[in-house]
């Protein structure tokens, strides 16, 4: 993005020259306004903040679109905006230039895809100890296809024979994910897919940020290729997306903790749908391997939030469904609150005293408040932690024993782990001072991170054995 891109565009029905470098877009009008005119027009005005997509043409004749920009005035008609993403059309010499609209499919490349969909699958045999056993099936490579909400997600491998001075390089192979849309998509739709797919690969790699090396959208258009008006041919037009990535150390290439598509046991669609929900939390994932080796209060609180969120989705009404007496008491309280609300509402309808009505309305409001609280109470954090540590013991026990050994602890009960986590969470949440992390708090933190994955994968209908394989690979 550090390269300079210049060109022309129209914004608010006005022609501008643009200068784009270092993620900053500057619009220069054909004629600069005088200082007095600009000062009087903008004096005391609060500029409206709106985010738009602005299209133009580069000085090399390519289509360009600056995505989700909000302009501010710099004076004399000059505008400036930060650009979080932009799109370059890969075709010129076409009139008019094709725009990034009515998109039919996207294709994505990246290291996370190479790890997830192993490109060496194009080798039919990997018994390299026997001469002549390595055969390449490059001519009949099959893709793995999945239908998600009527869109076809296709995993495949691209290969080519590179023109390289290195005579030892025979094939260049890259895995890709292609999504064929049932309905044509616009730029904002594509961005939504981009964010969801990144979220899925964050889950797969247990990393907060994931990069793609290439993100291309494409569509097919009809072109008249010569002077004969009937000579119409179809041409595929590509649009490459470029995104501003966070300034964080991303070390996915060094990570050995990842899983393959085959590990999901044909549950890709279910997992994708669940982990790309808006309510699915990924903020607690580590930034890198080094970030994964320490814990702080912020991480601790995010793990607590993610755990409770996943637990409530995986096991709704946990205590009510497992404790008959608790369920009876809860229903009795809710029935009483409902009865009192109805009683007060009826009294409001029959009463003419405005002061009395206001008082009754406040009482009804408080009843509604307590009703909401009682409905949401279904087991404490400590109870939920103990339940998960017991439920997923076969999966987490090896990790638990390793942590106990590392911290020179002979034995520790689930109740002690749960209480330590709960107490630390409460101190942080209520703004109370906290000491350095104890060994027990760190162990409970590490085990709960695994439990979150277990809850999610169980929601995706994976069996315990499949969950165990995935957990061992990620953690």
Where are these regions (language model features)?
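Short, charged N-terminal helix-start/capping segments
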Residues: 3-4, 8-16, 21-26, 30-35, ...
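Amphipathic, oligomerization/interface secondary-structure segments
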Residues: 247-475
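A broad, low-specificity signal marking well-ordered, structured residues that form hydrophobic/aromatic
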Residues: 177-179, 225, 304
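Phosphate-binding glycine-rich loops and adjacent basic patches that engage nucleotide phosphates
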Residues: 148-164, 226-234, 242-249, 261-272, ...
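Long, contiguous, compositionally biased segments that the model treats as domain-scale units
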Residues: 1-211
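Internal, Lys/Arg-enriched amphipathic helical interaction segments that engage polyanionic partners
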Residues: 188-267
